[in-house]
Amino acid sequence: MSAPLEKELLSRWQEWFNESPPASVELLAVGRRYRNSYTLLPFPNGGQEPVCVVKVAAGEEQASKLRREFGNLTLLRTRLTDQALLDSFPCPLALVHRAGLVVAIHSYVSGRSLPSALSYPHQREVIPRVLDSVAEWLVAFQAATKSEAPAPDNGHGDLADALASADEIELLRQMEGNGLATPQKMSGVWGFQHGDLKPEHVLWRGRSIGVVDWDEMRSGSVTSDWFYFLALSALQIGGVESNRQLGQAAPTLEAVFFCRHWFGELAMQATHRFLDRLSLPRSMAAPLFVLSVCRDSRYLWPYLAQGASGAYRDVMRLLKRRWVDLVFNRAA
């Protein structure tokens, strides 16, 4: 399988990288296969860093993800002018079909895997810088894309349809009843959002970040990206801490954010700075966190209510109501 891909790379090397091609490249499979897809990193002879990323898909589901990601990256490349932003995500190079496979080739984005920066106690002093860098990137991305993304309506509209539950609608009503704007009415935070901002999709560069895996990009609020990132970062840190203390279960999101936990405190401080940059009141921090996690609950469910019993929908309804009560009965 690697021979046709190697031939494709070498034949277009000059075009993509503006230099003469090497005698050969070594294609290394990284990570694990996932639903008929895998990733290759091509290293030229003697090279210390891969020159690009090759994503290969055999099934239609994964092939459609590659096409969608390639289209999203192409759209961003044609619309954005901020060079710092352009340098933070991959450049799409080619989308080719070979022997029943769909192959997407992107430029390589350097940086340190963010989960490794969140996993060790001695890294704790770095985490505020990491959080601020992610927040700054999201604010810049929103500012650069707000004129490109379709605008939301002025009511609950599309947001309500997407939530598929009366509990979130009630949360939106309570937000308005407490004098807080809902995401639908926050035009200052509407633009394109990454859509899947997990820690493993963020690369730490010391003073800036890189962002990869763009197949879920869509119109929306950057606040959703932010709180989804915080929730998964909390789970990453909680899991590492529980592994160090044998027999202790990882803390739930509720424990991290509504009880005293060092990451919850750092996350809330970073959230206040994030909202300041967006010119939003800090009192929106907790409601927006709950709303975002409620919307992503099907992905976060195993961590939301550890030890809970009962039907999924019933438990989630009780949990969301408790979170709403926590939000509006605590100081923001």
Indicate residue ranges for each PLM-predicted region.
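Short beta-strand micro-motifs within the conserved protein kinase catalytic domain, predominantly
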Residues: F89-L101
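ATP/Mg2+ or Mg2+-diphosphate-binding catalytic cores
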Residues: L278, V293-A332
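Conserved kinase catalytic-core helix
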Residues: L75-Q83, V109-P152, T182-M186
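An alpha-helical support segment within catalytic cores of ATP-dependent transferases
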Residues: L5-A23, K146-H194
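A glycine-centered beta->alpha junction motif in the catalytic cores
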Residues: R98, H106-R124, A143, V293-G307
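ATP-binding glycine-rich phosphate-binding loop
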Residues: F17-G46
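Active-site Asp-x-Gly
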Residues: R207-F257
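ATP-binding glycine-rich loop module of kinase domains
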Residues: L41-E69
